[in-house]
Amino acid sequence: MVSIEGRFNDASNFRIAIVVARFNDLITNKLLSGCIDCLQRHGVDTSESSPQLDIIWVPGSMELPLICQSLASKGKYQVLITLGAVIRGDTPHFEVVINESSKGIASVARENGIPIIYGVLTTDTMQQALERAGIKSNLGWNYALQALEMASLMKALR
C-alpha cells in the first residue's frame, strides 16, 4: 500500500497567489494577515519584493473565480488561496454569492489541475466573521496551511 500526503516543511519553491475580496475588508484583511503569517513561518518569502507570493485584490467574492481562472491559466502558480467574507443579510443575495463563487472556484481548480483553497467565510453575522478572522482564531492561517499541504501533495503526485 502506498500512502501519499502533503508536507509543510519545504515551501521554498512554491509560487503562491492570494486573491482577496475587498468587500468586508475588516474581515479579509485579518484573514490575509493570518495567511501571510503562516506562510512566512513555513519558509515562504513574504517580503514586498517576493518572487514567491503575489496578492491580488478584487472587489468582492463574485469576482474570485474569474481572477483565479486568469491566474491558473498562466501556469505560474502551484496553488491559489481565495479570501473573502460573505455575511448573510435580509435578501437572497448571500446564497447567490456563495453558491456562484464556490462553484466557480471549484470549476477552475478542476479544469486547470491546480489547488485553489476556498477561504471565503460564510457567516450569519459580523460577530461570527470576526471570531473566525482573529478574535477566537484566524482561519487565514488554516487556509495557508491547506495551501502548502495541497501544493506539496500535487508535487508528490506528479
Swiss-Prot record:
One record GO biological process: riboflavin biosynthetic process
Active-site residues per Swiss-Prot or TrEMBL entry: 93 (proton donor)
Record GO cellular component, one term: riboflavin synthase complex
Keywords: Riboflavin biosynthesis, Transferase
Enzyme kind, highest EC tier: transferase
Keyword Glycoprotein applies: no
Residues that hold (2S)-2-hydroxy-3-oxobutyl phosphate according to the record: 90-91, 132
Residues that bind 5-amino-6-(D-ribitylamino)uracil: 23, 61-63, 85-87, 118
InterPro entries (alphabetical): LS, LS/RS, LS/RS_sf
Reactions that this protein is recorded to catalyse: (2S)-2-hydroxy-3-oxobutyl phosphate + 5-amino-6-(D-ribitylamino)uracil = 6,7-dimethyl-8-(1-D-ribityl)lumazine + phosphate + 2 H2O + H(+)
Family named by the database record: Belongs to the DMRL synthase family.
Function according to Swiss-Prot or TrEMBL: Catalyzes the formation of 6,7-dimethyl-8-ribityllumazine by condensation of 5-amino-6-(D-ribitylamino)uracil with 3,4-dihydroxy-2-butanone 4-phosphate. This is the penultimate step in the biosynthesis of riboflavin.
HAMAP family per the UniProt record, alphabetical: Lumazine_synth
Name by which UniProt lists this protein: 6,7-dimethyl-8-ribityllumazine synthase
Taxonomic source organism: Prochlorococcus marinus (strain MIT 9211)
